[in-house]
Amino acid sequence: MAKARSRSAATEPAPGYANVPSAGNSGPTVPFCQGSKPETEIAYSWAKIEPSANAQVLGPIALPANGYVRNVWIEVETTTKGKEEAATIAEDMPFSIFEQIKLTEPNGAPLGMEMRGFSAYIANTLGAYAGSPYIENQIEFNKGLNEPRFAIRVPVELTPNGLGALGNQSASAALRLTLTVAPLGPAYYSAGKYEAGKVPQFTIRVIMELWGEPPERDILGRAVQQSPPFEGTAQYWSEQPSVTINKGLNQTRITRVGSMIRTLAFVFRETGVRKEGDKVANTGASNLQVQWDNRVFRTQTPFYNWQSQQEMVERIKERKKGVYWFCFSQGENRHAGEPGINSWLATLTSTRLELLNTAENAGTVDILVNDVSVTAINPLERTQQIGVGGYHPPVGQVSNVAA
């Protein structure tokens, strides 16, 4: 009689599965973005929001404690149409409906974004996070005064594999979102007004895009990476608003340094209105230059700058008057926003970073900086200082029969 062959650890099925390798011979670790799955969750909504003479602060709201935040989607729908009276729509509409969009740590420290609505539009478009990032291509987009309709994201994740996604598993230490609706006036129209009692009403919805918490092992018993790649990496969008541009030579200091810069954008204005002369912006300057420490390393004509937007931002239809950028995230496919870590601009807190231009007229410039921090901090310190996310509190073991 033949002797029965014993079953080794390599052939023994994992508990709960038939003919599945055990955890002891599981092979390589499964990447986070394969073990986890993208999810969405309604975070909050406000109904019957009607602009008035005063700004309206909505929030702060705590994002639902769930997984790792990828982005925060903010959707504006007109539920009661308005009726304007000989009004001329403001050039930054409909994005200027938001006087401020702010994502923060539990203690109020800025995290991810803190800027005005139009600046957030620039961040979405020139930051190039979506496959087609030009917001005005949205299927429901409407910029009209009487029935605006659009959506805008607070970008958190840098690349679709989870890089930059922020842990948000604790309800007592959740990320917070605050929206400020602009008062009636220049944010909506440059002339005219709404008829009395005919101001539109909005519903504003917030959807959290996230990665779910992955199981410790997959169905084949392989170990799954439990957090996004390079956990602790975080990006920020910040704004230096209304910096004075004088007639003549300007050397304007960019104050947000100390991390790796992914995108720089500039919005030139004259008396609050985006404007450009025959050459560049409201100032009529012949070139835009960026000085990095002791050398000028980017010099561009206006046409070159505008053309780079068209070439690198997928399906962009038109450039915005007075808006210029310098991209440090061009990927191998020649598009902005792709993995291009080698092109991020490294800075120190002592780095001299300046915008140089010669102005024919005085005005202002809004400086938008998208920088990436790659230094993780102790999760216990997350609510005590300006952190970089990656919070992962102690939790029970994930239930999985193959563990």
Model segments located where?
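Short, low-complexity Pro/Thr/Gly
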Residues: 2-403
